[in-house]
A protein has these predicted regions:
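Cytochrome P450 core scaffold surrounding the K-helix E-X-X-R motif
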Residues: 42-48
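Glycine-rich phosphate/pyrophosphate-binding beta-alpha loops
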Residues: 42, 85-89, 170
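Cysteine-cluster motifs in flexible loop/terminal segments that predominantly coordinate metals
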Residues: 87-151
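Extreme N-terminal starter segment of soluble prokaryotic enzymes
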Residues: 2-4
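Mid-domain Rossmann-like dinucleotide-binding core that forms the NAD(H)/NADP(H) cofactor-binding site
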Residues: 144, 151-153, 157-198
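Glycine-rich beta-strand-centered segment in the early N-terminal region that forms part
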Residues: 21-37, 50-99, 104, 112, ...
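Extracellular beta-rich ligand/substrate-recognition surface
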Residues: 7-14
Length: 198
């Protein structure tokens, strides 16, 4: 299928709006029509090339929410029409940590996060010349449609506005972790926030 996307072809240069070919979801993947995507400071850092990744060309954006259009083989917990938040972490499901119930420390997560590929080592986007265009953190929310791992697509209630839901994929979790886990802020305490995002 065709999808319009903002493609990064050089660090620090404007994104080009391109029509890409998007492959159908493979096993344990979903096709999502993106409704809203936030622009995190991590997206700006990546756009500048400050992460040192070799993933160009790439469709960026990792804070998105949308509606499931199709599911690949093996997907049982999502169906077309479900509202989802796309998460930038997709544990592999088969390493020792994952099978032990500790997918939050998946052994394959960090290497695959910076690869520009999905869990099977390939990308689903192709440009007009048939060349692969990489994914950003499994999400690539700066596209009308995305294919991502089902494990990285979290169902949310239909009544939750998707323009707010997209923030759950990164900034809410990051902010929550900083406040609750790191700073251990207690009810009634005051805090100051100097900046958010990567």
């Amino acid at each position: 299928m065709k999808t319009k996307a903002a493609v990064g072809r050089a660090w620090g240069e404007p994104y080009s709006i391109e029509e890409l070919e998007l492959e159908s979801p493979k096993e344990n993947e979903v096709l999502v029509k993106v409704a809203h995507t936030g622009y995190c400071h991590s997206d700006l850092t990546a756009w500048k090339g400050n992460y040192g990744l070799d993933i160009l060309p790439v469709v960026a954006g990792h804070e998105s929410a949308g509606i499931v259009e199709a599911v690949g083989p093996g997907v049982t917990d999502l169906k077309p029409g479900d509202h989802v938040v796309s998460c930038w972490q997709a544990p592999c499901g088969h390493c020792e940590q994952c099978v032990s119930g500790r997918s939050y420390i998946c052994e394959n997560l960090i290497p695959s996060l910076g690869s520009g590929k999905l869990n099977d080592g390939t990308a689903r986007f192709k440009d007009a010349d048939g060349n692969e265009v990489n994914h950003s953190l499994y999400v690539s929310g700066f596209s009308e449609y995305i294919v991502s791992p089902a494990i990285a697509s979290v169902k949310v209630p239909d009544e939750l506005p998707l323009d707010q839901a997209c923030l759950l994929g990164c900034c809410v979790g990051t902010g929550w972790g900083a406040v609750v886990k790191s700073a251990k802020v207690q009810p009634g305490e005051s805090v100051a926030i100097w900046g958010m995002g990567g």
